[in-house]
C-alpha cells in the first residue's frame, strides 16, 4: 500500500469518527425532543378528558334539576339513573419510520470512498498516460537528434571528399604544368647541347691527349665502384648495431635503385629528345637544300 492510500484511509477514519459522534448527538437530541413532545401530548389529553368529564357531569346535573322542577314531588321517589361515562382513549400518535443514521453514514462514507477511489484511479491513469507521452517524446527527440548527427557526419564527409578532390585536381594541374616546364627546359638544354656537341667532343679528346692513356669504360666503372664502395667492418658490432647497419645498407640500396631508375628514365628521355632533334635537323637541312637549288637555278637564268 502506498503512502497516499494510508493517508487517505487515516483521513477517512477521522472523518467517520467525527461524523458518527455528531450524528449520535443529533439522534439523542431528537429522541429527547420526541419523548418530551409525547409526554406533553399525553398530559394535554388527560386534562382534556377530565374537563370533558366535568362538563358532562355538570350538564347531567343541570338536566336532572330541571326535570325535578318540572315533575314535582311525585318524581322524587324515582331512582335517579346513573350517568354513563364512556372511557375516552386519547388518540395514539403513530411512531413513524425510524431513521437509521448508521446506515446513512455508512452509505455516505461508501459513496465518498468510491468517489475518492475513482479520482485516485483517474489521477494515476492520467499520470501513466503523461509518462508514456513523455517517453515517446524523448524517443522522438533522440531519434531526431541521431538523424541530425548522421546528416552532419555525412555533410562533413562529403565536404572532406570535395576538398580532397579539389586538392587532387590542383596537385595534378600543378604537376602537369611542372612536367611541361621541365620538358621544355630539357628540350632547350638538349638543343643547346646538340649545337655544342662537336666542340665538347674536341675538348674531351684534347683532355684525353693531355692526360696520356685513354681510360676504357670498364676502368671507369671500377674506379667509380671503388670510390663508392666502402669496407664493411661488422665484427665489433652488437645485435642492435647490426640491425641499424642493415637498415642503413638497405636504405643505401634503395637510394641506388631509385637513382638507377631515374637515370634510366632520363637516358630514355634524352635519347628520345636527341632523335626528335635529329629529325628536325634533317628536315631543316632538306628544306635549306631545296631553297638553295632554287636560288642557284634562278641566278643562272
From Swiss-Prot:
InterPro entries listed in its UniProt record: TNNT, Troponin, Troponin_sf
Record PTM text: Phosphorylation at Thr-216 by PRKCA induces significant reduction in myofilament calcium sensitivity and actomyosin ATPase activity.
GO biological-process terms attached to the record: cardiac muscle contraction; muscle filament sliding; negative regulation of ATP-dependent activity; positive regulation of ATP-dependent activity; regulation of heart contraction; regulation of muscle contraction; response to calcium ion; sarcomere organization
Modified residues (Phosphoserine): 2, 211
KW Hydrolase (keyword) present: no
N-acetylserine, modified sites: 2
Region (Disordered): 1-99, 125-223
Coiled-coil ranges per UniProt: none
PANTHER family reported for this sequence: TROPONIN T, TROPONIN T, CARDIAC MUSCLE
Protein name per its UniProtKB record: Troponin T, cardiac muscle
Amino acid at each position: 500500500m502506498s503512502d497516499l492510500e494510508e493517508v487517505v484511509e487515516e483521513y477517512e477514519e477521522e472523518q467517520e469518527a467525527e461524523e458518527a459522534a455528531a450524528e449520535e448527538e443529533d439522534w439523542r437530541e431528537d429522541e429527547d425532543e420526541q419523548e418530551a413532545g409525547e409526554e406533553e401530548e399525553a398530559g394535554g389529553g388527560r386534562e382534556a378528558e377530565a374537563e370533558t368529564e366535568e362538563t358532562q357531569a355538570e350538564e347531567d346535573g343541570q338536566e336532572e334539576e330541571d326535570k325535578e322542577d318540572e315533575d314535582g314531588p311525585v318524581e322524587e321517589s324515582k331512582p335517579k339513573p346513573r350517568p354513563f361515562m364512556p372511557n375516552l382513549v386519547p388518540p395514539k400518535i403513530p411512531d413513524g419510520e425510524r431513521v437509521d443514521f448508521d446506515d446513512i453514514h455508512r452509505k455516505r462514507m461508501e459513496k465518498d470512498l468510491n468517489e475518492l477511489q475513482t479520482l485516485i484511479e483517474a489521477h494515476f491513469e492520467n499520470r501513466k498516460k503523461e509518462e508514456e507521452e513523455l517517453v515517446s517524446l524523448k524517443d522522438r527527440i533522440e531519434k531526431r537528434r541521431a538523424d541530425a548527427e548522421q546528416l552532419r557526419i555525412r555533410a562533413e564527409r562529403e565536404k572532406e571528399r570535395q576538398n580532397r578532390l579539389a586538392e587532387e585536381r590542383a596537385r595534378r594541374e600543378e604537376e602537369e604544368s611542372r612536367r611541361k616546364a621541365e620538358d621544355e627546359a630539357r628540350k632547350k638544354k638538349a638543343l643547346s647541347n646538340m649545337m655544342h656537341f662537336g666542340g665538347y667532343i674536341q675538348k674531351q679528346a684534347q683532355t684525353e691527349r693531355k692526360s696520356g692513356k685513354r681510360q676504357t669504360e670498364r676502368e671507369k666503372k671500377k674506379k667509380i665502384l671503388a670510390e663508392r664502395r666502402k669496407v664493411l667492418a661488422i665484427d665489433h658490432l652488437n645485435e642492435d648495431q647490426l640491425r641499424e647497419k642493415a637498415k642503413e645498407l638497405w636504405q643505401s640500396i634503395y637510394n641506388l635503385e631509385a637513382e638507377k631508375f631515374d637515370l634510366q628514365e632520363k637516358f630514355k628521355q634524352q635519347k628520345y629528345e636527341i632523335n626528335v632533334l635529329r629529325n628536325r635537323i634533317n628536315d631543316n637541312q632538306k628544306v635549306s637544300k631545296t631553297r638553295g637549288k632554287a636560288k642557284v637555278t634562278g641566278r643562272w637564268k
